Regions:
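Conserved active-site motif detector
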Residues: 1-129
Length: 129
């Protein structure tokens, strides 16, 4: 089975204790190990899978439709290994590999690496001549 990138959702909800989810995501580095924890007693979703940093801080959850898929694989005896991939404006991303394989970060295209979407465009500087 091929490695997959999965969204980490719920990143703006507060944690019961410790630092906030978005703060913890901000200090995660691409390639850091990520822990996936099933939450069968979650009152909102019995298939919920919490995503935690290598420091044990909850980052959010895997989207519900992907959580059902991952949970089914676990029940069938498959294993998963996950790493932090990236953070964007609305969610975090993790990379997961299956059955003892090590996840690797996807290649970044030259366009994505060089783009500047900061919204800051300085005024041109003209010579006084």
């Amino acid at each position: 089975m091929r490695a997959q990138s999965l969204a980490i959702v719920g990143i703006d909800f507060p944690n019961a204790k410790g630092p906030g989810r978005r703060f913890e995501l901000e200090i995660c580095r691409p390639g850091e190990p990520i822990e996936l924890r099933p939450e069968p007693k979650n009152p909102f979703d019995e298939h919920a899978i919490a995503v935690c940093s290598c420091r044990g801080i909850q980052l959010g959850y895997i989207k519900s439709e992907r959580a059902v898929f991952i949970g089914t694989l676990w029940r069938q005896g498959h294993t998963t290994t996950a790493i932090f991939q990236a953070l964007d404006a609305t969610c975090g991303w993790l990379r997961v590999a299956f059955d003892g394989k090590v996840p690797t970060l996807p290649a970044v295209s030259d366009d994505a690496a060089g783009s500047d979407d900061s919204g800051f465009f300085p005024d041109p500087v003209y010579d006084d001549d």
